[in-house]
Amino acid sequence: MNKKRKRQLPVRKQQNEFITPAILRRTIRNVLPFYREIVRNPAYSAAWVQAVNTIDFVQMERLFQKVSHAPIAELGSGYSFGFRTPMRDRLYVNGFFLDPAQSKYTVGEHLVVVQAILPLYLRLATDIPFATRVTAAINSGNTTRLNSLIRGLIRSRFLLTIRAQDSGFRISFRFPISRKIYTNYTLLGVG
């Protein structure tokens, strides 16, 4: 009996770098005052959307620094805040982008999305075991597990997708009338 053994192909590891619950929580805690202010203060929210739509990074940084004293390492397209990590030349980034890219943010749609993600961010900031489970799902690239952890905290009929990506996650919302897709992300970037 000469049975041929099938050659086992090596399991391809995902390209994610491992992110820790501490890095995730620190990033979320740094942006949480900003998102709270967007929800709490209509004038601040309108000023923010105006700065984003006119690509006024100086005004965006000024507005962010009014509510969070966290140092910003990057402000990118759409908008994003990059925070240093212990990993050399790596930032953990949180922000939004809009698809199609040439679209303009509206105060109302932006507010709806921020209100939807706020419960998730509050939980990540305050619940270490939850942040640990989310981080484990991110590090393993397990989008199904990540969905089951996050989806119950985001109560919005506009929620489109939740994905593990780049040692972080992307949460997308679609507004049917405008056909715009707002994507909130927290992921590892280059600094």
Predicted segments with their positions:
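C-terminal-biased regions
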Residues: 2-191
